[in-house]
Amino acid sequence: MNENNVALITGSATGVGRACAIRFAEEGFDIVVNYSRSKTEALETKSLVEAEGAKVLLIQCDVSDDAAVQAMIGEVSSEWGRLDVLVNNAGTTEFIDHKELDELSEEIWDRILGVNLKGPFFCVRAAAHLLRVSEFGSVVNVSSTAGIDGRGSSVAYCASKAGLNTITKSLARALGPEIRVNSVCPGPIDSRWLKRVMTDEQLAEETSGYPIPRPSLPDDIADTVLYLSLGTTLSTGQLLVVDGGRTM
């Protein structure tokens, strides 16, 4: 069995996932870096994590594929024999105006729900036997305020995150006390994902009226994920909003 604690962060090639991988490595964890298509970026994350002194297991897996998820967790088990923290960060969306109902095809619905909703469930189900025997088994789902207030990149994305918030509560009841399950709900994140549709100026204007008038950074979310994993032992089934006070 691996001597160090182990964290698996899905979708950790870039952005919030990469920030989480580095943050846990700084805390002495060895890291499972998961990616679906972004191998070049995942290798960059691997190098950054290794620079913190951590060991890295790099695994390609589309979390919407249940069999692939089972294989990923099987590899973690065979290589390291433990898993202490699961961060369900992998996500996808399409930027579709909510009024454009006809643009939201069944194919888009299936892809978004597959990655954002089914994927976290598949990962928890596959990893539960490892998390149960950890001294502090923890699942943190990276959700969104879109799942709370219905404002987001598409109707399907909002629905997927609302579902993830509910799954968080259901699994917290089902898996406690051995495993805690919580969600972090960011607002707008200053990342390349959002910058596909917003300039820096537009993002600054969007957040200018918030009580804390700036967008979240990947490190803000990583710090929250770390807190929910290690900084509290009595919180489960909770949605922790990190959006500068927009959502109250």
Where are these regions (language model features)?
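Substrate-binding pocket helix/loop in short-chain dehydrogenase/reductase
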Residues: 97-110, 206
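Short, small/polar-rich loop/turn modules that mediate ligand/substrate recognition or access, typified
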Residues: 82, 176-180, 235-237
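Residue(s) in the substrate-gating loop at a strand-loop-helix junction
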Residues: 144
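Active-site helix of classical SDR
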Residues: 124, 160, 168
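Alpha-helical segment proximal to the catalytic Tyr-Lys
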Residues: 129, 172-177
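C-terminal substrate-recognition "lid" of short-chain dehydrogenase/reductases
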Residues: 124, 217-242, 247
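Conserved glycine-rich cofactor-binding loop
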Residues: 13-14
